[in-house]
Amino acid sequence: AREYKEALEEMNIEVDIFRVSDEVAKTLPQYYLINSKEYKDEFESINVIKSGKEILDYDAIFMGSPTYYGNVSGPMKMFMDSFSDIWVGAPLSGKIFGCFATAGSQHGGGELALQAMNIFAQHMGMTLLSVPCSVRGGYPAYGILHIAGDNSDIRPNDDAKIGIRDYLKRLNI
């Protein structure tokens, strides 16, 4: 999310970052949390979003999720389900949508998590910003996928950061 924010701001696009509440993350075994301690304060300082109604005025929406058992996290799924009361009115129709995910391994279900977020966006009537094959890094068309390692100890490298910037250059806002 930080890389997206920095890249979009370099393009003079105003950016707000939100996170969903994730009580599950607080219960993870310590060996998962060791590698993320340095990011804990930064993460917790991000405003929690509770409902889809909070993002109706944005021109573009980028969602990101860790991969839990081959899908988006439970809290992300609950957030997507919070749009059910606004779905019929289609207030997000035509807005740009992109997504990103992390997974422990290449075959850890990251593409399925990306597809779940894309399907959600399609049901909302949003316009998908696919990842073309020309974007550096060999990402799936569904969104940017970062392989974080079994213990989430692999951070995005320079190639990933360049890939994100290449992808976001396709925005027309």
Describe the role of every protein-language-model region.
Residues 107-112, 145-147, 167:
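A general structural signal for short secondary-structure boundary/capping elements
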Residues 1-89, 137-140, 147-173:
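N-terminal beta1-alpha1-beta2 submodule of the flavodoxin-like/Rossmannoid cofactor-binding fold
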Residues 93-139:
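Short, glycine-/small-residue-rich phosphate/pyrophosphate-handling segment
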